[in-house]
Amino acid sequence: MSNRGQLSIEMVILVLAVLVSGSYVALDLSKGAFETTAVNDVQESSYCGFTPDFGATSIDKALVKLTTGIININPNAAVTNNEFNATYTNTTDNTVVTYSLDNVHPNLIKNYADGTIVKVPLNETWKNFTASNIILRMKSDYVCTINGENVSMESNCFEITAPLGSDSFDFQMSAGTGAGQYYLRLVDQEVTIEFSLE
């Protein structure tokens, strides 16, 4: 087995072990670790649904695709580099709702196919998405840290899959304590993995 393949398996096993153990993990990723100093490719594409509290009825086999761009911004400033968006597709009737972040105010924007726009305040309790996996693609010359231990990124990506015995886990975006900081949190069975993008 190649070192790259072995590393990838070891990383997944490590993450799964941490999730099952119930401990808290903080994974700090600087903006410089991503191509063009941004989160270019943080995406999830699988058959799953939003939680009902998110404002969309949870529908079996609904396709959710998340793409995150530059998220280390101040939501209260009139900026244009806020590139977070998510698309909810009901595979039963093919209706689509897209989600984005307000460039001026800390709101989550829901855009419906009929042109209706609904703004939801973004706060620490921003509701969860449900995912079966999420991939962070990073530049090969950077490392990430899990529980204080550096993990080589030779495979150029960091993939987290659902814990053993689970088909999915929840993740959410929420504002941090500092101005312009956002956090992507993966939550499953009271376990949180936090990606701090600063």
Curated annotation (Swiss-Prot):
Where is motif QXSXEXXXL found? Answer: 6-14
Instruction: For this UniProt record, give its keywords in alphabetical order, as a comma-separated list.
Output: Fimbrium, Secreted
Q: Cite a GO CC annotation.
A: membrane
Oxidoreductase recorded as keyword: no
Localization, UniProt:
Secreted; Cell surface; Fimbrium
> What's a Pfam family this protein contains?
Class_IIIsignal
Propeptide residues, chain positions: 1-5
Query: What post-translational changes are documented for it?
Result: The N-terminus is probably cleaved by the prepilin peptidase EppA, which recognizes the class III signal sequence.
Description of the deletion phenotype:
Disruption of the gene does not change the piliation compared with the parent cells.
Q: What induces it?
A: Expressed under standard laboratory conditions at 35 degrees Celsius.
Determine if Lipid metabolism is one of this entry's keywords: no
Q: Which InterPro entries match?
A: Class3_signal_pept_motif (IPR007166)
Q: What's noted about domains in the record?
A: Contains an amino terminal motif QXSXEXXXL, which is part of a class III signal sequence.
Q: What is this protein called?
A: Probable minor pilin MMP0709
